[in-house]
Amino acid sequence: MAGVLKKTTGLVGLAVCNTPHERLRILYTKILDVLEEIPKNAAYRKYTEQITNEKLAMVKAEPDVKKLEDQLQGGQLEEVILQAEHELNLARKMKEWKLWEPLVEEPPADQWKWPI
């Protein structure tokens, strides 16, 4: 990358990232590391791992910022970085919550019935 292409994101509170490719590579790698600690059969791991690997491959393959933004379809790369940070936080919480384990007690029979 030949340097910063813009001076502002135009979004209040969201600063320009000077090294978006590096930042995204780090975040996606951290997400994948956390997902490794979740059982392979857990739906969250399966789908998040697939999406994260696809995005990481795009980041590694496309050096042009604008083209990468178009491929990722998540707005500006700074917005994609913010999304990746949120996904990393969620992955850590999912690991902590152990949502793949069975419920402590059975839900009420009509819990999902509507109208009651």
From Swiss-Prot:
The modification N-acetylalanine is found at A2. The modification N6-succinyllysine is found at K98. The modification N6-acetyllysine is found at K30, K46, K60, K98. It is a peripheral membrane protein. Keywords: Acetylation, Electron transport, Membrane, Mitochondrion, Mitochondrion inner membrane, Respiratory chain, Transport. GO terms for cellular component: mitochondrial inner membrane; respiratory chain complex I. It comes from the Eukaryota. Belongs to the complex I NDUFA5 subunit family. Complex I is composed of 45 different subunits. PANTHER family: NADH DEHYDROGENASE [UBIQUINONE] 1 ALPHA SUBCOMPLEX SUBUNIT 5, NADH-UBIQUINONE OXIDOREDUCTASE 13 KD-B SUBUNIT. Accessory subunit of the mitochondrial membrane respiratory chain NADH dehydrogenase (Complex I), that is believed not to be involved in catalysis. Complex I functions in the transfer of electrons from NADH to the respiratory chain. The immediate electron acceptor for the enzyme is believed to be ubiquinone. This is NADH dehydrogenase [ubiquinone] 1 alpha subcomplex subunit 5. It comes from Pongo pygmaeus (Bornean orangutan).
